[in-house]
């Protein structure tokens, strides 16, 4: 059986000493999409932000348990969070391009690493925008502001910005919820293509999206991971009544 690329064990997250994520254990596997579903406030986004230590930015957060990536607990004091976030990139719910050109958005992380060679930057821009399925739409206006793009295009530029740092894992927090159906469909097509080269985890409120995209699904309720397994099996024959009720729209 394929070894997981990342292992979460007994992870708990406290906000102001209130336990909002409760002893969660979950594996992410190479070249798979894992969907995280559940009602609002159930802990999905909290888990996602724990995987690349975005929760560190909130001083009121305390975390226990472990997340093992590359053989090391990412919560070890030795972990360089800047390097970690290059390998485990994140795309947010609202498209958040920087107020600069499309080109500069994509190479932002590379410039932070000190890369100045134009040929390297040019290659990264083209390959990353192609990876995000937007190259043909913007190749003739790379020096236009990314803020002037449509919402769906902005989100794909944000995906390209993540790809440019050569991550192994991409985290997506409801990446299509602010988009129209056509733009959302383009994002979904892009994610399915990216699965060949990356591992993805996506928080989604859409059961249809989870069933279309994901290989595995985890169902969260009030901070607990109640059920996790292959998506087809979970949607066809959930083990927990709470899972069945949520998938069928009876609550949440």
UniProtKB/Swiss-Prot annotation:
SUPFAM superfamilies: P-loop containing nucleoside triphosphate hydrolases. GO terms for cellular component: plasma membrane. Pfam families: ABC_tran. The keyword Signal does not apply. ATP binds at residues 38-45. It is found in: Cell membrane. Part of the ABC transporter complex PstSACB involved in phosphate import. Responsible for energy coupling to the transport system. This is Phosphate import ATP-binding protein PstB 1. It comes from Streptococcus pyogenes serotype M1.
